[in-house]
Amino acid sequence: MNVQRAKEISESAEQANVSFQGMPVMIQHVDENSETARIYDAANPERELTVPVKSLEER
């Protein structure tokens, strides 16, 4: 995924089908400078991670 699309998803009210290593996730925030995203596991919102945006996949 690219940074612009990740930002669109994070700012949208709609829920997108995004995954990280096969795990459904929600994007909280995108840092354009570092090209990373703060995500959390859709099934376990307390599990937060910061990952490279390019590692996210939209299904």
Swiss-Prot record:
<keyword id="KW-0749">Sporulation</keyword>
<dbReference type="GO" id="GO:0030436">
    <property type="term" value="P:asexual sporulation"/>
</dbReference>
<dbReference type="GO" id="GO:0030435">
    <property type="term" value="P:sporulation resulting in formation of a cellular spore"/>
</dbReference>
<dbReference type="InterPro" id="IPR012610">
    <property type="entry name" value="SASP_SspH"/>
</dbReference>
<dbReference type="Pfam" id="PF08141">
    <property type="entry name" value="SspH"/>
</dbReference>
<comment type="similarity">
    <text>Belongs to the SspH family.</text>
</comment>
<protein>
    <recommendedName>
        <fullName>Small, acid-soluble spore protein H 2</fullName>
    </recommendedName>
</protein>
<dbReference type="GO" id="GO:0042601">
    <property type="term" value="C:endospore-forming forespore"/>
</dbReference>
